[in-house]
Amino acid sequence: MYPADLLASPDLLEPLRFQTRGGVTVTRRATALDPRTALDPVIDALDRRRGLLLSSGVEAPGRYRRHALGFTDPAVALTARGRTLRIDALNGRGQVLLPAVAEALRGLEALAGLEEAPSRVTASSASPAPLPGEERSRQPSVFSVLRAVLDLFAAPDDPLLGLYGAFAYDLAFQFEPIRQRLERPDDQRDLLLYLPDRLVALDPIAGLARLVAYEFITAAGSTEGLECGGRDHPYRPDTNAEAGCDHAPGDYQRVVESAKAAFRRGDLFEVVPGQTFAEPCADAPSSVFRRLRAANPAPYEAFVNLGRGEFLVAASPEMYVRVAGGRVETCPISGTVARGADALGDAAQVLRLLTSAKDAAELTMCTDVDRNDKARVCEPGSVRVIGRRMIELYSRLIHTVDHVEGRLRSGMDALDAFLTHSWAVTVTGAPKRWAMQFLEDTEQSPRRWYGGAFGRLGFDGGMDTGLTLRTIRMAEGVAYVRAGATLLSDSDPDAEDAECRLKAAAFRDAIRGTAAGAAPTLPAAPRGGEGRRVLLVDHDDSFVHTLADYLRQTGASVTTLRHSHARAALAERRPDLVVLSPGPGRPADFDVAGTIDAALALGLPVFGVCLGLQGMVERFGGALDVLPEPVHGKATEVRVLGGALFAGLPERLTVGRYHSLVARRDRLPADLTVTAETADGLVMAVEHRRLPLAAVQFHPESILSLDGGAGLALLGNVMDRLAAGALTDAAA
């Protein structure tokens, strides 16, 4: 949104006077604010005053950094509907600027009409003329008016001054007309941009905030000494509003089937239909914004008071178009999976996403279309994919994202870059025009702002915009969330409908004020260890202290001693349980059998892990074998065959293994019962038929054994049953 070092620069605090390309004289002054509270007055005021706040709540090197910028009571508003753009002075300061704007528009060839009034200028663009595809963005449109305004105020050395606001979906039809089926409401606007003269900028990383104020001199006078202000435009709750969706049950699935038929005909490659969820909302928009920002930080966050009681609250994950110094960037997102219950669950979901052929195809098609968009306005050979299928995590979702760049060719500007991508394939489909016609024919309501963009058009020639998705539109007491899914030929109708609902979930919670819930934690182990003492025999192991920690979580008191000292301590300490740790080498290297004998002589229960199981097998006359390949740090599904240690656990568990030795099934002692095995029959757990002895070959303390809290639950059973003397009863 602005250079990373801007707020730290001493030059910003020095008054600056410059002249724009169109002859407007500008004076800039900046003052320091308390970064802890700088934005709060802006956010609170946006409940009733026109304005906007843009922020980024995430860090992604090379793509995003945390920052924020906001304002209220802008001087000028630019509003478009169809091919007409209205420019309004919102206060006395805006009235100083309006004559200069009118002068800049007089004689503009792209206009069919221009009306001037003291506080308003209305410009109507001419009908488009046929142009080569490379010049499509130069067709007469409301953007012709925007380009003239940008040229009037052009100031290459100021990175903050510009137009801020939102662009609606229907703007694309000025360049790609389609047959419109859906009736557009009378209050729909296609564009709303503000020209602010007071901005608050925050750099949370540097801990800096600045109020940046501008004064203007035009032929009509100076803004110096004129008050900032404007009318109230509050949100009006409606206690009679009802929740709902613009798709009845089964409707979206039928859209998916219709799309699949279009894919088979070759009409479409992909398409992204949406559905809108409505929630009554009595809370202030600022409250919804604060909840959403806290629960779902995103690269493109926005809170916009659009006037007329309409608001946007956004936490968009996707860059639309960013332009700086002639470099054009986009970050198309496609490929979605739900977050896991914890970090291990996330890892499994990331793997699922990255190995999904459908999700890979989704993003590939999006990026190929995106590259084509850039090729229209960029230098030959400059369009490159600089990031491929990168993972981004959000509160409920995991996405894959590409990063694409290009260099604008001579004669092209930021608006050309903006328009060539309208609208992003990630919210429309491909081929774009056919996809947009499909959306018009099958969606149940107009998109309004959804699928468009919001952000900044800079007077320095730059641009930073986010795609308008994961955005709440609030009006007349109702909050609306629209969400879509990318459909391909192999789409499952129910899964695509579920994806829409998943994408909308965090936003519906923010509307309702529903807490997302605390971060998931591992299930607590049974407290069977309360009051019990454990001696943990360390066989030079690298995981022994994690194992001790798990045992302590059962309430037990644990003492860890190296194998060379542990046996002598047995008689002195008389623990309630002896635990034989994993370790390198063979059981004989540590005389594990001797430790077991010493424990049995004292009547102490023994539990073994990995090497401990191998030592137990050898102690009772069994034999070990060497695996064809070591299994170190590998996850394995084991099948539970019974036994007290697995009481209450599922029949199949995923566990972590670190071993190259294994008990020979054909030489297993008759006194030992196998209670768990791998799919190919390898021994994974044993229990003694008469004595309080049990062991597992896998590592219950490994992160690979975290799934469902299996490792902790098993050790809870160890304390509850083995240490308590209940194991032999169960084994018998």
Swiss-Prot record:
The active site is at C610, H699, E701. Keywords: Amino-acid biosynthesis, Aromatic amino acid biosynthesis, Glutamine amidotransferase, Lyase, Tryptophan biosynthesis. It comes from Azospirillum brasilense. The keyword Lyase applies. This is Anthranilate synthase. NCBIfam families: PRK13566.1, TrpE-clade3, trpG_papA. GO terms for molecular function: anthranilate synthase activity. Signal peptide: none annotated. Residues 533-728 form the Glutamine amidotransferase type-1 domain. Its EC number is 4.1.3.27. It holds the Pfam family Anth_synt_I_N.
